[in-house]
Amino acid sequence: MKVNKKITAMLLSAVIAAAPAAAPIMDVQTVAAATTTTKTLKNAWSKNHKYYYDKNGKKVTGVKKIGKYTYVFAKNGKLVTNKKYYKYNAKTYYKIAKNGRAKKLSAVETLAAIRLKKCGGNLKKAFNWSSSVRYAGNYKVAKKNVANYAKYGFQTGRGDCYVQAATFYQMAKVAGYDAKYVKGSVNKGKGLAPHAWVEIKSNGKTYVYDPNFQSEFGKKGYTGYKITYGQKGTLLYVKTSKGR
């Protein structure tokens, strides 16, 4: 009997050893992941609307016109949004809305943006720069308008009240303020004289910004920054234009 049991045990061991190993059960999720492929986006926006992919499926960088609108993408491909004056390169600036739609600044707006950037985007520093423009009454511009006055001031650092007001107006507009360039006259004690200044509306009130007044009377303790019409220590302003 013992011999038979030994033989039986040996035969069972041989059968088990010869049997093929059971195949491992692969996780169903692993199989699904292995067989799923990600669709490459081409000429399309990403789901979060932060990136745009070109015809080769690569992220777009730089300036790109998509449909009717222009957009600017950073070096990493991310859409640039909500910038009052975005520096694309040394000579090109864009105003970019919250949805990313971009508008290239004009030549005079670009000059204003460059100067404003040097002022750290600070309105008071921009005003001080305009009031520091050296007085020059004998100058020529192609056409006497706010754009040409401002260009002359930014390019030469010289000019009169029209130029000083024009440079500040352009910087205030680029910075996003509700600004108007105003022409008229003021009384400096010797009758009315032609003059120009800037109005900015803020919280329902209209304030006057007069860089020329600041340059003339600032050292005497007076200010032309954010004053109101009729304020003590200021000029009598008479408007002849509605501003722009």
Language model features by range: what are they?
Residues 4-13, 17-114, 184-199, 203, ...:
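Extracellular adhesion/carbohydrate-binding repeat motifs centered on closely spaced tryptophans
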Residues 153-157, 187-190:
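A glycine-rich, coil/turn loop motif that links secondary-structure elements
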Residues 166-232:
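Hydrophobic/aromatic-rich core segments of domains that either
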Residues 122, 157, 192-194:
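Generic hydrophobic secondary-structure packing signal
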Residues 229-244:
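Short, low-complexity, Pro/Ser/Thr/Gly-rich segments in the mature regions of secreted, periplasmic
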Residues 126, 157-172:
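Active-site nucleophilic cysteine motif
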Residues 105-153:
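Secondary-structure boundary elements
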